[in-house]
Amino acid sequence: MSTRTFLAALLAVLLLIAVGCGGGAGKNDNSRSLIFWTAEDNPDRVKATQAIINRFTLQTNIKIKLVAIGEDQLQSQIASASAAGTLPDVLAAASLGFVHSLAADGITDPDAAATVINALGRQTFSRRALSLVEASGKPVAVPSDSWTQLLIYRKDLFTKAGLAAPTTFEAIRAAATTLSGSGMAGIVAAAKADDSFTQQTFEYLAVANGCQLTNQAGAITLTSKPCRDTFQFYVDLLRTGSVQGAQDATSTRAAYLAGKAAMVIWSSFVLDELAGLSNDARPICPQCRADPSFLAKNSGIVTAITGPDATQPSQFGELTCFAITKDANNDAAKLVQFLMNDGYPAWLGLAPEGKVPVRTGTSDQPTKFTSAWTHLETGVEHTKPLSQLYPPGVLKVLATSADTMNRWGFPQGQGRLVGAQLATLPIPKALAAALNGTLSPAAAAEQAQADLETIKQSIN
């Protein structure tokens, strides 16, 4: 081979290597590879995710590069990748607020999301889930699963005291007052100023009372009667029926697992812990020593609640989504379709207690995925199928929870505002000030209103 021929061949090889080492693939790139980011960065879940996408590669010969990124790092990583032109093709386990924020910045591909949803069949998804991911009439991402905020209560204590299930503000207040005392808190709920868990807990009660962040025109409405009443209810409830201090996710869960609280507001991620399947958060109530699953057997679960200013029950929850980015390879839609179909039960199996299906089944088998979900193994060091831990009625309520899910801002097209206010958490700060007596509940609502108006002006 001549020197000139050798150099030409070498140059060709180097060019191929350079293309292969590039960032996110463009729309017209026919290379059979995808970059897949996921916010599920727990090592066990990363391993399980790799197994799922390996199945996709075997079926399609499309290679996937899996990158796990902590949820708290997603915003900065996406911003850097967007600036560098190296966006992933697909982003998994992205929250509702985050995908709406990405869409507002032009990072997601609504047409690609619509293609996936239509191919799978819109009728196979929760209608509410589809409506929550829409902006300007188009889906900004494909909803994959949900977790829901729950009010969990001790059925045995309620029965003994003759109390009604805590499905209304009135019933919650009555139970908290009646059961509080002798080392028992009537209820434990988040109260920490700089904690998103406080935001989620308040929003749960707010939407249940008909309180919305904004009206349809986008004006902040935290001083409306339903919102002012929710501030008052939250403060009164924790002052008279709970323990004092800045409660958070860890302390509230610990109190209920120790048998020191009759009610707790927590997410569905606590369900395996109630059954004693996690060594990091085990039930230690007096009865739990003989039966680690005592709390799972003796806890009632409420999803939707009704406040006095509301006309129907409602609840807070979170949707997680698959977002296809604007520069994605054409094969990205195929991957998401696989994850929402053949790979869907395994995806839900990463953490079934916190991954409730929002696609119930297929056109031919309408309940295929909800049925499969009830038999998925949950737990950490120990595992059991959900169906062995909770009765069918509880699982049915959880499986349909997305249908009564209500979220601030998204129905009003204010997804960007929702994301922006989570950066400074003005509502938890106002609540904490009311709980420690610095502000009255009414003044707390006014402070939160003013802070939200400032945030809204800054992003417009």
Q: What is each residue range found by the language model?
A:
Residues L274-A275, R289-S293, P308-L425:
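C-terminal lobe and pocket-closing loops
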Residues A176-T178, A217-G245, A290, F294-A304:
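Glycine-centered hinge/linker elements that transmit conformational signals in sensory
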Residues L96-T148, R173, T198-T201, D291-I305:
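Hinge/lid segment of periplasmic solute-binding proteins
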